[in-house]
């Protein structure tokens, strides 16, 4: 089995990178790909950089060169569901863009032309994530994660997302681009992110303070999922 793992920022991948055995580094187009073994499973861990373009590029390199059987997107997110606190987990059952608008041509809000309205995570990976959450005693919410090239910390941006995607549980900047590329390659994916902030006018302050907490939670969950896939759980 080969597993692809992708995160945007140094803090989001550092803990997992340090756990990879026999690691080798490939650097291409601004992305870092660490290949090796995690709990005896072949993995490739990508640090893509921030935003949709960087995420799509990193995912394409991952899928084209490493050819994993599945992709896990890890990292942090801004919480929208009222029950979420810093360090809690969101598990995607679907992802959508919040900053795409071609509704003039009959598409749904967030739907890119000639693409699905949403990208659905593999049910087996969603179940795996939720089972891993339960074993770790974490709190998680499953649902819609929305992505866009904006850090949401203003009232207007938040109101737009809540009005357009009232069912959204979290917002971040890469997941839908990753899912979009996985869809193009027909590779199953799931997004498991930890909450670093609630998407409000103080979110930039809490993000800086709690990114490490979120990274610890999401990395711990990814490790648990890998161990389960390796038959160690």
From Swiss-Prot:
One of its GO terms (biological process) is L-methionine salvage from methylthioadenosine. It comes from the Bacteria. Catalyzes the irreversible cleavage of the glycosidic bond in both 5'-methylthioadenosine (MTA) and S-adenosylhomocysteine (SAH/AdoHcy) to adenine and the corresponding thioribose, 5'-methylthioribose and S-ribosylhomocysteine, respectively. Also cleaves 5'-deoxyadenosine, a toxic by-product of radical S-adenosylmethionine (SAM) enzymes, into 5-deoxyribose and adenine. Thus, is required for in vivo function of the radical SAM enzymes biotin synthase and lipoic acid synthase, that are inhibited by 5'-deoxyadenosine accumulation. Pathway: Amino-acid biosynthesis; L-methionine biosynthesis via salvage pathway; S-methyl-5-thio-alpha-D-ribose 1-phosphate from S-methyl-5'-thioadenosine (hydrolase route): step 1/2. Its EC number is 3.2.2.9. The active site is at residues 12, 197. This is 5'-methylthioadenosine/S-adenosylhomocysteine nucleosidase. It catalyses: S-adenosyl-L-homocysteine + H2O = S-(5-deoxy-D-ribos-5-yl)-L-homocysteine + adenine; S-methyl-5'-thioadenosine + H2O = 5-(methylsulfanyl)-D-ribose + adenine; 5'-deoxyadenosine + H2O = 5-deoxy-D-ribose + adenine. GO terms for molecular function: adenosylhomocysteine nucleosidase activity; methylthioadenosine nucleosidase activity. Belongs to the PNP/UDP phosphorylase family. MtnN subfamily. It holds the Pfam family PNP_UDP_1. InterPro entries: MTA_SAH_Nsdase (IPR010049), Nucleoside_phosphorylase_d (IPR000845), Nucleoside_phosphorylase_sf (IPR035994). Homodimer. Keywords: Amino-acid biosynthesis, Hydrolase, Methionine biosynthesis. Substrate binds at residues 78, 152, 173-174. GO terms for cellular component: cytosol.
